[in-house]
Structure formats: structure tokens, C-alpha cells
Regions:
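PLD/PLD-like phosphodiesterase catalytic module centered on the HKD motif
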Residues: 2-3, 7-150
């Protein structure tokens, strides 16, 4: 299960679902930008990463530039590509669109693109997440209270 999104701030049910999948042995990967366009949204996104990492989710931060792609790849044979971010605003407020591909050549092409993105990304670790400064942790916790508005 590969998820590509520039913004990550989800409801607890989605967060838990990804953790449960990883606990069950599913290869769950989150591909995000290392260079954000919205700093506060990025700080909030990182508050979710610790739990994901603790459950074995791999988080790749794309380093060459801003990654604005939005896709979900399931079992290397189903892909969803569209305008859907993984955040509250998308799921509760906005009308988004996407195209679902199943057993089509474009799925393999997307998989190749995702492999390229991961090759150009740095793997973020739980150790890195735990090394965040006290100031960053505090600031992020306060910002997360307003995650539904970011």
C-alpha cells in the first residue's frame, strides 16, 4: 500500500487503519515532500508520523523538490490517482476527483514512477522523529489542535 500525498493530517480511523495494516504485515509506505509548500501543514503532518513509524510504516521524504502527487497503490495492481490529499479538508470539506485503475498498463507505469520517487527520497526513521527538539514537539502539538483547518 503506497500513498503519495503532499499533506497528511487524517482522522484517527484512517491513522489506525494504516497502523493495523502495517502490523498485519502489509508493506505500507507514505511518500511525502521533504520540502513543503505549507510549513504549518508539514509540521502538523509530522505529528502523525511517530505512530506510523512505530507500527512499521515506511515514510519516504522526496528530496529533489516539492512532491505534489496524490496517489494510492494497492497490491501493485490497483491505483487511484487524482486530486485527493490525505487530510481533513479533503475528506470533510472539498470535492475531489480521482481515477481508479485496475489491471491496466498505467498501473505498472505508476509503480515505476513511485519506485523512482522512493529512490530519490530519504527514508525517515523513528529515531529521527524522536530526536525532534522540545520546541518543535510543543509547537507541533499546538498546531495539531487546528489540523482540521490546515
Amino acid at each position: 500500500l503506497y500513498i503519495t500525498t503532499p499533506y497528511y493530517a487524517v482522522e484517527e480511523s484512517m491513522q489506525k487503519s494504516l497502523c493495523i495494516a502495517a502490523d498485519a504485515g502489509v508493506d505500507v509506505r507514505l511518500l511525502v515532500p521533504a520540502i513543503p509548500d505549507k510549513k504549518f501543514a508539514y509540521v502538523v503532518a509530522k505529528t502523525y508520523w511517530g505512530e506510523l513509524l512505530a507500527h512499521g510504516v515506511k515514510i519516504y521524504r522526496y528530496t529533489p523538490g516539492f512532491l505534489h502527487a496524490k496517489s494510492v497503490m494497492v497490491d501493485r495492481e490497483v491505483a487511484l490517482v487524482g486530486s485527493t490529499n490525505m487530510d481533513y479538508r479533503t475528506f470533510q470539506l472539498h470535492y475531489e476527483c480521482g481515477v481508479l485503475f485496475y489491471h491496466m498498463p498505467v498501473v505498472e507505469e505508476l509503480l515505476e514512477d513511485l519506485d523512482d520517487i522512493m529512490a530519490q527520497s530519504s527514508l525517515y526513521t523513528l529515531e529521527e522523529w524522536n530526536r525532534r527538539s522540545w520546541l518543535e514537539r510543543t509547537f507541533a502539538s499546538v498546531l495539531r489542535l487546528g489540523a482540521i483547518w490546515l
